Amino acid sequence: KVTDNIRLKTYLCRPMQRKFITNLALVLALNLLIKPFWILGIDRAVQNAVGTEQYGFYYAIFNFSFLLNILLDLGITNFNNKNISQNNHLLSKHFASIVLLRLLLAGIFAIVTLVGGLIIGYIPDMMKMLIAVILNQVLISFIMYLRSNLAGLHLFKTDSIISVLDRLIMIAICAVLLMKYSAPGSFQIKWFVYAQTAAYLITTAITLFIVIGKAKVRRFTWRWPFFVMILKKSYPYAVLVLLMTFYNRI
C-alpha cells in the first residue's frame, strides 16, 4: 500500500512538474527577449537623448523614492503568493480587503516620501517628478501583488505574459517618441517617466480585470482586524525583503 501511494503521488505530481518547467522556460524566454532590448535599446537611447544631467536628475529621484519602498508591501505579496497557492478559495475572501490595505499603505508611502523630499530641499520641479515616480512605484507594487494571485492560482502562462507586458508597452511608447524627437536635447525625461506611468496603468488594469474575474469580488469593505492579522502574518516576509535590500545595497 505504501508503494502504491508513492507511485500515485509521483504520477499526480508529474503534470504539475511539467507545467512548472514549461512555464519557467516561458518566463526565461520572454525575459531574455524583452529585458535586454529594453535595457540596451530603449533605456540607453533615452539616456543619450536627454543627456547625463537630465537622466541623473531622474535617477536620483528614483533612488530616493526607493528608500521607503518597503512601506508599499510589508511582505504582503510573498505571504499572499504562499497563502493563495495553498488555499485558492481564500482569494475571493481576502482580495478586496487586501486591495484596500494596500491603498492605505500607498497613501502612507506617498505622504512620508513627499515630506522627506520637502525636508531635504527638493525644488518644485523635483517634487513634480517625485510625485510621478511615487505613482509608478505604487503601480509596480500593485502589479506584483496582482501577479502573486495569478501565481497562487497556478496561472503561470498568464503571469509570464504580464511580467513583460509593462516593458512591451514602454518599448512601444518610447520607440515612437524617440523616432519623433531624435535630435539631441529634444527628448524630455518627463516623457520617459510618463511612458512608464501609462504602461503600468494599462498593465494594472488588465491584470486587475483578470484577477477580479477569478476572485468574483462583490464589494470592498474596511476590516481593521483583518488588516492587523494580515500584517502580523506578512511581517516575516517584510523583514526578509528588507534584509535582502540592505544586502544588495551595501
At which residue positions do the language-model features occur?
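Transmembrane-helix boundary and interhelical linker motifs in polytopic inner-membrane proteins
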Residues: Q17-R18, V46-Q54, L68-L101, A151-K157
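Alpha-helical transmembrane segments of multi-pass membrane transport and lipid-handling proteins
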Residues: L33, F37, L72, A96-I123, ...
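Alpha-helical transmembrane segments of multi-pass membrane proteins
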Residues: L67, L103, G107, I111, ...
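Hydrophobic alpha-helical transmembrane segments
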Residues: M127, I131-I134, S160-G213
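Interhelical loop/hinge segments that connect adjacent transmembrane helices in multipass membrane
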Residues: K9-I21, G185-V193, A205-R249
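Membrane-interface junctions at transmembrane-helix termini in multi-pass inner-membrane proteins
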Residues: N83, L139-I162
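Signature of the first transmembrane helix
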Residues: K19-T77, N136, I171, Y235-I250
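Residue-level recognition of pore/gate-forming positions within transmembrane alpha-helices
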Residues: N63-F66, R102, A106, Q137, ...
